[in-house]
């Protein structure tokens, strides 16, 4: 393989897909009996903003600069928020903010479906988001392999797995 990806969770699967898109032969190595990591048993809440197509559809104003400000500006912290993340590296936060909307579109292109509801601020702790950014993955019971706890995280992981396999990515479980 040209590329070996360690782990098949919410970071590993997209890495494998992008490498395959670039023409590389890819193998994903996973220590578990199934793909998905912690993401497959998550609630399927995906906090991406910065002007996603979902935000635009529902008239929500957001931008990469606003995402960056929300992640680095201490004056925005809400009373019950977790301020610790504002210690994160500013360059990493800038890169995250600049790629949020592109990441959302990548998930859609990879087959991830989100509930037809406006993004909101549920599914987490009030971190001081000035715009609704929480998207909720959709998964229909019986539509394929599900997580052991039937959580919506499968609505993110299974489409990513299917996309990777369709692009020739091999898995070593």
Regions picked out by a protein language model, each given a short descriptive name:
Residues 1-11, 27:
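Beta1/beta-strand and adjacent pyrophosphate-binding region of the FAD-binding site
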Residues 9, 22, 164-167:
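Extracytoplasmic low-complexity repetitive segments enriched in small/polar residues
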Residues 16, 20:
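Gly/Ala-rich phosphate-binding loop of Rossmann-like dinucleotide-binding domains
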Residues 21-42:
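Glycine-rich FAD pyrophosphate-binding loop
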Residues 31-34, 46, 51, 119:
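Short, ordered loop/turn segments at secondary-structure junctions
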Residues 41-73:
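N-terminal glycine-rich dinucleotide-binding loop that anchors FAD/FMN and/or NAD(P) in oxidoreductases
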Residues 56-57, 78-95, 145-147:
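Second-shell loop/turn segments in exported
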Residues 92-173:
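Conserved redox-cofactor binding core of oxidoreductases
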